[in-house]
Amino acid sequence: MSMPGFSYDGGFAQYVTVPDADANLVKLPDAVDFTDAAGMGCRLMTAYHGIVEVGQIHPGDWLVVYGAGGVGLSATLVATSAGANVIAVDIADDKLALARKVGAIATINSRETDPVEAVRELTDGGADKSVDALGISETLHNAVNSLRSRGTHIQIGMTAEGPVGDVALTINDLIAKEIDFRGSFGMPAVEFRYLLNQVAASKMKPGQLVTKTIALSEVNDALTAMSTYNTVGTTVITDFTR
């Protein structure tokens, strides 16, 4: 698998090359503006595949999302547009405020409240589905433990490489509760059609995730802020003249 920004140059430019463009280049519908398109990016596509295709979310499902960064906020937006009841968990109040703006019906600051107990109370026993959008031991365990019996966990956040990224799970608990544990990675190009139809019909508005626009010359500062988790929502390059 090859991906822009990993296998070849990314898209921080007015013009980019697209290998195998007949499969990898997708025409933007006229009804989708550039802000919504930029708000989609890797994070929303990854969340869409995890929530809709892998997680098989349904209207009325209780979903708890651990992490309100790019992927977590996108998961909240996607699940809300599908009719789910979303609970967002994070340690930053500004990120939780944005989660509410894009559809979360409840938010939990896990620095102040036991998130597992809070989710169980809000859902009368446990969520139907959970997402770990971070990929660290604490959020993974809390996400799984927030589920009701026969609940489904969707693991989107990737752990660190090597032994340091290994996470031990209490398998007997998963067996006893008959938990369905599913991994989700990226989004195949074939799903673009369904995602873009949702956006074109205004059933989903990725532009809600865009909180800042910058010039190309400001990219390095933006990436530094992202690497230290000092951002909220999505930053989009709109000025390529400087």
Located regions from the model:
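Glycine-rich phosphate/adenylate-binding loop and adjacent beta-alpha elements
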Residues: 1-25
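Glycine- and other small-residue-rich loops at beta-strand/loop junctions that grip anionic moieties
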Residues: 15, 49, 64-68, 88-89, ...
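Glycine/charged-rich beta-loop-alpha catalytic/anionic-binding loops adjacent to active sites
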Residues: 24-34, 125, 177-178, 203
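Mid-domain Rossmann-like dinucleotide-binding core that forms the NAD(H)/NADP(H) cofactor-binding site
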Residues: 32-113, 117-118
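Non-catalytic, hydrophobic alpha-helical segments
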Residues: 47, 136, 219-222
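Glycine-rich cofactor phosphate-binding loops and adjacent beta1-alpha1 units
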Residues: 55-57, 80, 91, 97-180, ...
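C-terminal capping/lid region of NAD(P)-dependent oxidoreductase domains
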Residues: 63, 121, 128, 154, ...
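C-terminal substrate-binding/catalytic core of Rossmann-like NAD(P)-dependent dehydrogenases/reductases
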Residues: 120, 124, 162-212, 220-221
